[in-house]
């Protein structure tokens, strides 16, 4: 009789454990939110429906675009203090951030420059490019006050000659809690960078 009771108690404990584990897994599944993905835009407030020149004019190479290691990840980065950052794991970039920045600029710069003769890095060695725009992103985040900031060191080169080498800083009001507003503000900063590149590059294409 004692052996039978012991056997039944063990079975009861086993089923109780499995039942609790099942409820725990179901609870975690219900409470976890799906990851949301975002893309930057470099054409905020810009009309991209401009007539482009075809197979004439100099060829422009966009890139490479380089990021510091702390930004080279899919999770979004938010500044908690001047020297402290946190990752927002539930909100991520839809692709590598350097590729996202490159694509966003590539989609809007041709219309602003009036030419479709632009290729993205890396490009074939031949025929090569006449002008190259290189960008080093030094800062791209939202600070503890909800201010988005983009700091970029960028240059325009022609063959082996550097025509312009400049550091630019752009800001836009974002949010400390609303991810959509953060991405919108970062897109506004990227748009400003693209406009500054156009102002300096367009006169060289004539």
Predicted feature residues:
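C-terminal/domain-edge helix-coil "capping" segments
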Residues: 29-50, 176-206
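Surface-exposed short loop/turn segments
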Residues: 29-47, 112-160
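Short secondary-structure boundary motifs at beta->alpha junctions and helix caps
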Residues: 84-92, 161-192
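N-terminal segment of the mature soluble domain
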Residues: 56-125
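Soluble periplasmic/extracytoplasmic beta-strand elements of cell-envelope proteins
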Residues: 59-64, 77, 132-136, 149-153, ...
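Bacterial N-terminal signal peptides that target proteins for export
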Residues: 2-17
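C-terminal motif of bacterial Sec signal peptides marking the signal peptidase cleavage site
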Residues: 24-27
């Amino acid at each position: 009789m004692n052996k039978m009771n012991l056997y039944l108690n063990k079975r009861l404990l086993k089923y109780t454990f499995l039942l609790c584990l099942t409820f725990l897994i179901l609870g975690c599944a219900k409470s976890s939110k799906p990851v949301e993905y975002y893309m930057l835009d470099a054409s905020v407030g810009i009309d991209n429906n401009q007539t482009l020149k075809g197979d004439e004019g100099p060829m422009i190479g966009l890139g490479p675009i380089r990021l510091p290691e702390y930004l080279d990840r899919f999770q979004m980065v938010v500044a908690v203090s001047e020297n402290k950052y946190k990752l927002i794991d539930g909100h991520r970039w839809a692709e590598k951030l350097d590729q996202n920045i490159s694509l966003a600029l590539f989609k809007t710069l041709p219309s602003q420059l009036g030419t479709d003769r632009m290729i993205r890095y890396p490009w074939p060695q031949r025929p090569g490019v006449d002008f190259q725009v290189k960008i080093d992103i030094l800062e791209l985040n939202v600070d503890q006050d909800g201010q988005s900031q983009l700091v970029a060191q960028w240059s325009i080169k022609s063959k082996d000659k550097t025509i312009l080498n400049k550091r630019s800083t752009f800001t836009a009001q974002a949010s400390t809690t609303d991810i959509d507003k953060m991405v919108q503000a970062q897109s506004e900063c990227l748009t400003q960078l693209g406009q500054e590149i156009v102002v300096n590059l367009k006169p060289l294409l004539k």
